[in-house]
């Protein structure tokens, strides 16, 4: 079994905020770490990269009178360092759309779609003031379906409908606010209409695709798929490979979708195993996981599968598209201009990154929009991490140290009572249930299993009271602490995908080394044997002794300093 894990490619014109992070890259990382324990490191590849082409970058470069690549080089390096060094994202390859491997792959791939490519003249919005053909996203207006006043020329963020610049009411240039004119120009179109039935049959028959993804994809098909332009008139992008399209570039959405393939190709090319990428894209025993935000569902559930089908290469179609709803910030949408939210280069200076990783997974908006509040973030850290998990670990290890000189006692299975057996069953079943939920893209739901086990362990200690049993019934005390110590090993493995450093810390306190050598399937086993010596005990987590108001004030101070350090493009 091979597993390909992907996350939506962040566009380099802004530092990702917490909502961006949980919607794609962090969720993908947590799943990838789980998958490596489940299927073996050699069978899992996790790829993503920087999306850096298109008009927004071209415009910023024009303002600064420099080459676009100079801007994106800085932004790509900044984001990559943030993800890998700060947020501990375990990419196998974090690529970029300026990669030569990517550009070559895209051009070769699109040539293969020739049967489904047609050339048409189209009226494209043009801003006479800015002297620029305007991409769909640089046209703003009123959605004709729901009346949303800030709809874009390609899609309404409010109702999710696909739009065209012509369909917008009171369309305006997003740069200067002037109404655009429409100029006739020739463009190349991918004929999506050829794939409606195939997309419907594929998505309907999937037993692993989440309902929200199925709903959006089937709605698109029902409304009727139409040809989509795959070329643009801007200069900053991959030159179109079609005859007669010498002054055109490939629409960023089409080429960015192919980044999942090119990043895999590039990864194995760098390893000197140039053909191995095919095992992850062309072999039947591969599962492919895409972690995205809900606004990207149509591109991943309709356009990408259609492109893969059209290539006739028998590429694997997505197994699971895990699309989150929106994460709000104190009841509002994240907004860079209004400074509403927290950005990932600020968050790490406010509290430990792995605390943030846990907070965001616990708030992951899997079924509906979720509201981030400082009060809830504090509750998650101080109650769930410290009280439920950390306190349980400390209680167990301290008693082993105190009553058994740090040596795990020998159990007597013949006298296990129902409470003993119930916790053993939970130890065995919790990783299994967590894994099953993860495999469906339900990362937050899977994380619940960690807390269920920790809370059950705490309750078990309270009910069995080993501090009393050591005086009255040593054999039963032995059983309680033997089972409890083993539950901590299970907890450490389950916590690892979310908090790799803290879980390894707990693992080491158990007197074990190299958590990454464990397997997920063994997580539910009682593998810590009698006579095993535990390690040095220390508090696993610390409570945050600040109020929400104090945290927000500190964030403002941090923000002023961080903004000075960002590359030009990201300020």
Curated annotation (Swiss-Prot):
Cell compartment(s), UniProt: Cytoplasm
Biological processes annotated in GO: methionyl-tRNA aminoacylation
Keywords for the protein's UniProt record, in alphabetical order: Aminoacyl-tRNA synthetase, ATP-binding, Cytoplasm, Ligase, Metal-binding, Nucleotide-binding, Protein biosynthesis, Zinc
Annotated binding of ATP, by residue: 336
Entry coiled-coil feature ranges: none
Superkingdom of the source species: Archaea
The enzyme's E.C. designation: 6.1.1.10
Binding-site residues for Zn(2+), renumbered to this chain: 143, 146, 156, 159
Entry note: cofactor: Binds 1 zinc ion per subunit.
Motif placement: 'HIGH' region: 10-20
UniProt catalytic activity: tRNA(Met) + L-methionine + ATP = L-methionyl-tRNA(Met) + AMP + diphosphate
Residues making up the signal peptide according to the UniProt record: none
PROSITE patterns: AA_TRNA_LIGASE_I (PS00178)
InterPro entries: aa-tRNA-synth_I_CS, Anticodon_Met, Met-tRNA_ligase_1, Met-tRNA_synth, Methionyl/Leucyl_tRNA_Synth, MetRS_core, MetRS_Zn, Rossmann-like_a/b/a_fold
Gene Ontology MF annotations: ATP binding; metal ion binding; methionine-tRNA ligase activity
GO terms under cellular component: aminoacyl-tRNA synthetase multienzyme complex; cytosol
Primary location recorded for the protein, binned into one broad class: cytoplasm
Short sequence motif named 'KMSKS' region, residue ranges: 333-337
Tagged with keyword Phosphoprotein: no
Family according to the record: Belongs to the class-I aminoacyl-tRNA synthetase family. MetG type 1 subfamily.
HAMAP family listed in its UniProt record: Met_tRNA_synth_type1
Task of the protein: Is required not only for elongation of protein synthesis but also for the initiation of all mRNA translation through initiator tRNA(fMet) aminoacylation.
NCBIfam families: metG
Protein name: Methionine--tRNA ligase
Protein species of origin: Sulfolobus acidocaldarius (strain ATCC 33909 / DSM 639 / JCM 8929 / NBRC 15157 / NCIMB 11770)
């Amino acid at each position: 079994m091979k597993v390909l894990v992907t996350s939506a490619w962040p566009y380099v014109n802004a530092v990702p905020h917490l909502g961006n992070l949980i919607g794609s890259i962090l969720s993908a990382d947590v799943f990838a770490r789980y998958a490596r324990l489940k299927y073996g490191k050699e069978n899992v590849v996790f790829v993503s990269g920087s999306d850096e082409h298109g008009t927004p970058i071209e415009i910023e470069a024009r303002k600064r009178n420099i080459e676009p690549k100079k801007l994106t080089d800085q932004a790509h390096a900044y984001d990559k360092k943030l993800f890998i060094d700060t947020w501990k994202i375990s990419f196998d390859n974090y690529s970029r759309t300026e990669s030569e491997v990517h550009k070559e792959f895209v051009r070769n791939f699109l040539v293969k779609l020739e049967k489904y490519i047609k050339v048409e003249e189209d009226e494209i919005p043009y801003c006479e003031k800015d002297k620029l053909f305007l991409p769909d996203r640089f046209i703003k207006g009123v959605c004709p379906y729901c009346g949303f006043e800030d709809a874009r020329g390609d899609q309404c963020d409010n109702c999710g409908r696909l739009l065209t610049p012509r369909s917008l009411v009171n369309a305006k240039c997003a740069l200067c606010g002037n109404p655009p004119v429409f100029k006739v120009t020739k463009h190349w179109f991918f004929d999506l209409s050829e794939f409606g039935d195939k997309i419907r049959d594929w998505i309907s028959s999937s037993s692993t695709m989440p309902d929200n993804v199925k709903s959006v994809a089937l709605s698109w098909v029902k409304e009727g798929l139409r040809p989509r332009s795959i070329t643009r008139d801007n200069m900053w992008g991959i030159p179109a490979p079609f005859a007669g399209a010498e002054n055109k570039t490939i629409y960023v959405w089409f080429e960015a979708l192919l980044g999942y393939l090119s990043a895999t190709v590039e990864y194995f090319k760098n390893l000197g195993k140039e053909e191995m990428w095919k095992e992850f894209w062309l072999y039947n025993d591969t599962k492919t996981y895409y972690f995205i935000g809900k606004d990207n569902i149509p591109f991943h559930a309709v356009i990408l599968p259609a492109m893969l089908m059209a290539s006739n290469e028998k590429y694997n179609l997505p197994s699971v598209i895990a699309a989150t709803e929106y994460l709000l910030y104190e009841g509002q949408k994240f907004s860079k201009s209004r400074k509403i939210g927290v950005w990932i280069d600020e968050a790490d200076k406010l509290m430990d990154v792995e605390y943030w990783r846990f907070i965001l997974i616990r708030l992951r908006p899997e079924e509906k929009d979720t509201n981030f509040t400082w009060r809830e973030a504090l509750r998650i850290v101080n109650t769930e991490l410290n009280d439920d998990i950390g306190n349980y670990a400390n209680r167990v290890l301290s008693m082993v140290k105190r009553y058994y000189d740090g040596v795990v006692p020998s159990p007597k299975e013949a006298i296990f009572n129902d409470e003993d057996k119930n916790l053993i069953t939970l130890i065995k079943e919790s990783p299994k249930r967590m894994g099953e939920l993860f495999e469906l893209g339900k990362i937050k739901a899977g994380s619940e299993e960690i807390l269920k086990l920790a809370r059950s362990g705490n309750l078990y200690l309270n009910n069995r009271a080993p501090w009393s049993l050591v005086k009255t019934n040593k054999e039963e005390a032995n059983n309680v602490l033997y089972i409890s110590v083993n539950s901590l090993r299970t907890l450490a493995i389950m916590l690892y995908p979310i908090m790799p450093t803290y879980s390894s810390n707990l693992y080491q306190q158990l007197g074990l080394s190299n958590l990454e050598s464990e397997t997920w399937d063994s997580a539910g086993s009682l593998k810590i044997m009698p006579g095993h010596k535990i390690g040095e005990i220390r508090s696993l987590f610390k409570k945050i002794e600040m109020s929400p108001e104090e945290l927000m004030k500190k964030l403002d101070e941090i923000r002023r300093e961080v903004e000075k350090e960002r590359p030009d493009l990201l300020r």
